[in-house]
Swiss-Prot record:
This is U-poneritoxin(01)-Om5b. It is found in: Secreted. Residues 24-41 form a propeptide. It comes from Odontomachus monticola. Expressed by the venom gland.
Length: 61
């Protein structure tokens, strides 16, 4: 009886560890994707503002 209770406790701890690790990995992946999207949006906006200024400077306006 003690062995089955110990096995059950071990199985519960193992499953909780696996679920926590998976949730942590998913959260990290989501945060990384958000950071990448934010960086792309920043550089896109910067280029959109810089290109007209660069072309104006080249044309001497």
């Amino acid at each position: 009886m003690k062995l089955s209770a110990l096995s059950l406790a071990f199985a519960i701890i193992l499953m909780m560890t696996i679920m926590y690790t998976k949730a942590d990995a998913d959260a990290s992946a989501d945060a990384e994707a958000d950071a990448d999207a934010e960086a792309e949006a920043f550089w896109g906006a910067l280029l959109a503002a810089a290109i007209p200024a660069i072309t104006s400077a080249i044309q001497g306006k």
